[in-house]
Amino acid sequence: MIESLIALIAAIVGLGIGYLVAKKINDAKYEIFVEQAKAKAKAIEYEAELILKDAKNSILNAELEVKKKYEEKTHKIQKDFNQKFDDLSKKEQKLQQEEEKLKEDKEYLCKSQKHIQDLQSDVDKLKNKYQEKLDDVLKILEHSTGLTQNEAKEIILKKVEENSREQIAHIVRKYEEEAKNEAKRKANFIIAQATSRFAGEFAAERLINVINIKNDELKGRIIGKEGRNVKTLEMVLGVDIIIDDTPGAIIVSCFNLYRRAIATKVIELLVEDGRIQPARIEEIHEKVCKEFDSAILEEGETIVMDLGLNKIHPEIVKLIGKLKYRASYGQNALAHSLEVAHLAGIIAAECGGDENLARRAGILHDIGKALTHDFEGSHVDLGAELCKRYKEHPVVINAIYAHHGHEEATSIESAAVCAADTLSAARPGARREVLEAFLKRVSELEDIAKSKEGIKNAYAINAGREIRVIANAQLVNDDESVLLAKEIAAEIQEKMQYPGEIKVNVIRELRAVEYAK
């Protein structure tokens, strides 16, 4: 029984100890749980603070962005407003000038009317005076000659008519001279205004370009083995390449500005690259030609934008850029056309015409010069046909014809273009007749060679003393090349006048290319 009691007491003690241990464990777990809960709460609170901070930053950034956009929009609106205000101010100023001009014209008209009234009064007085004298003379004649009044009246009237005709002719001649002098004075004033308001740049075109090189070793590489590279360059580029004892320089000579510019760029790229060989020359030449086509279009677009013109066909825009590489009597065609455009606009505005239309006609009046190397015909006919094809304004077409006297100028704008063309061309030093005659002669040389069947291209070199003709190897054989050279030489002798002799050099080259795959 004692053992049972001891066992019971032990069980109770064990249960008490177990309860205490369990309670302590539960208390520890509870404390851990509370700590974890607090940690989670702090983490959530921290995360909430971060979210709130991000939200505040987002709101602040949004406010700044909205404020920035608002300021930009406000600035743009203010800028547009200022621009429109300036435009309105200019228009208002122009209207005031026109109003002043109208007032001056009105005053002049009033003075003219008063002058006419005074003249009419003088005529009436003279008429009355002549009538009185006529009556007196009739009485004297009747008394002294025995003539009837009608007969005497006829004699007197005839005499008076003769005297009156002389006086009227004198008055008419006087007013005609005054009108001519006034018109001449006004024309001189308008031309003086136009030339004083426009100052164009002018630089004489050269027939050579000088390329600077670092050392004379490059000259040898450009010449190549047995002159292979320089021959390829001259054949592909169609220019004369002069390599002499001049230190650090190679000269590119050609009458064609476009070919000379391309040749200069090709040689500069080859010198920079260092790989100078026939295949590389052709590769660089093809690349430069594409770049020049893009540059020409860009040049035309810049000119059109600077002149404030619109709705010009892209093909015409490209030809405007191409005028940069054309010259007439030593004067650059694009520079000349720009001068004419600006001067024509000013003259037309002074005469009450459309300034914008006059500038359009001015820039396009010589557009045919961009086509003369590729098509037959005068630049006037080529330019007019081009503008008709692309539906240009009739005033533009009339200006193209009128500036060389093919038609009469039918508008203020056309007349302004004719006057501006004369001003630009007649300016001292603007043109050189001898140079133009030389360019015409070498162009004729190339045209004669190109007119033959089977000819791919032709280049006049050595100042026109040699014509290099590139034959199509698939259309012309070796025997026909000899005949072609003789035919071209014979036609040159028949159609042209020149000092010394001209060498005709027909080149036929056949290339077979295949790729191993």
UniProtKB/Swiss-Prot annotation:
Superkingdom as given in the UniProt entry: Bacteria
Keyword Nucleotidyltransferase on entry: no
EC number(s) from the headed UniProt entry: 3.1.-.-
Recorded GO CC terms: plasma membrane
CDD domains: HDc, KH-I_RNaseY
Compartments in which it is found: Cell membrane
Domain KH, residue spans: 207-273
Keywords: Cell membrane, Endonuclease, Hydrolase, Membrane, Nuclease, RNA-binding, Transmembrane, Transmembrane helix
Gene3D superfamilies: Hypothetical protein af1432, K Homology domain, type 1
Protein known as: Ribonuclease Y
Gene encoding the protein: rny
